[in-house]
Curated annotation (Swiss-Prot):
It comes from Shewanella oneidensis (strain ATCC 700550 / JCM 31522 / CIP 106686 / LMG 19005 / NCIMB 14063 / MR-1). It comes from the Bacteria. Keywords: Cell inner membrane, Cell membrane, Membrane. The gene is syd. It is a peripheral membrane protein. GO terms for cellular component: cytoplasmic side of plasma membrane. This is Protein Syd. It is found in: Cell inner membrane.
Length: 216
C-alpha cells in the first residue's frame, strides 16, 4: 500500500493542529530560498520565519535517475514520500520519541536530496550493507529514520551501522502512528556538511551530522 494517503492525512492534520492551537500556520526559516509553500510575500534578504502550506507538485518528482545511476530499483514509496509535495520538514510526536519527517522545500532542494540519497546508498554498498534510504530524524537528530529498500519497513539507523530497531512494517503504517508536534520555528546554525547547502533536507542533516560526529 502506498504511503501517500497517510502522508496526505498527516500534512492536513499538521496544519490544522497549528491553526487550532496557535491560530496560525506553521512557520519555517527559509534562509533566502524561495518556495511555492510560502504564504505571503517572500523577501530573499529577510531573516524572519515564513508561514507555509504544503503544495502538491504539478509534475511529481522522480528518482528514476538515481535508480539508473546506481543500477538499483528503489522501493516505490520513495516517489510518493519525496516526489508529491513541496513542504518544510514536519515535526512529530510518537511512542518512539519526538522527531522530524524530511520534505522537499523547492526543486533545488529535491536535486540536492537525490545527491545525498545517492551518497547514502553508495556508503551502504561500500560497507556491504543492505540498501536503505532516509525519511527523517529521531531524538533531535541523534538517529536517522530509514526505509529498508527490500521490503519498505521503517527502521532506526545510525549512519555507518546496520538498522537497529524496526518501527513499522511499512511507511504508511509508520506515518499513521505519528502525531503532529506543535513548536516554534528554530533557526539552525550553519554547520559543516559535505553536501550542497539547501534549506529543507540539508538543514536537518547538518544538525544530525553535528550531533553524531560530536558524540563519536
Amino acid at each position: 500500500m502506498s504511503c501517500l494517503p497517510a502522508l496526505d492525512k498527516f500534512l492536513q492534520n499538521y496544519h490544522q493542529s497549528y491553526l487550532s492551537t496557535l491560530g496560525e500556520l506553521p512557520r519555517y526559516y527559509p534562509r533566502g530560498e524561495s518556495s511555492l509553500c510560502i504564504q505571503g510575500e517572500f523577501v530573499e534578504a529577510s531573516t524572519e520565519a515564513v508561514g507555509w502550506l504544503p503544495v502538491k507538485r504539478e509534475q511529481p518528482g522522480s528518482f528514476t535517475n538515481v535508480e539508473h545511476a546506481l543500477e538499483l530499483k528503489l522501493w516505490p514509496d520513495i516517489h510518493s514520500f519525496y516526489g508529491q509535495y513541496f513542504a518544510a520538514p514536519v515535526l512529530f510526536d510518537s511512542t518512539w520519541g519526538t522527531g522530524e519527517l524530511l520534505q522537499v522545500w523547492n526543486e533545488a532542494d529535491f536535486d540536492a536530496l537525490q545527491q545525498n540519497i545517492i551518497g547514502h546508498l553508495m556508503m551502504k554498498q561500500k560497507l556491504k550493507q543492505p540498501p536503505t534510504w532516509f525519511i527523517g530524524l529521531l531524538d533531535e537528530g541523534d538517529k536517522m529514520l530509514t526505509v529498508d529498500n527490500a521490503d519498505g519497513s521503517v527502521w532506526i539507523e545510525i549512519p555507518g551501522e546496520l538498522p537497529s530497531v524496526q518501527l513499522a512494517t511499512s511507511l504508511a503504517e509508520f506515518i499513521a502512528a505519528l502525531s503532529p508536534r506543535i513548536a516554534p520555528p528554530v533557526k539552525h546554525e550553519e554547520l559543516p556538511m559535505p553536501a550542497q547547502d539547501h534549506p529543507g533536507i540539508f538543514a536537518s542533516f547538518k544538525r544530525m551530522w553535528h550531533n553524531l560526529t560530536g558524540k563519536r
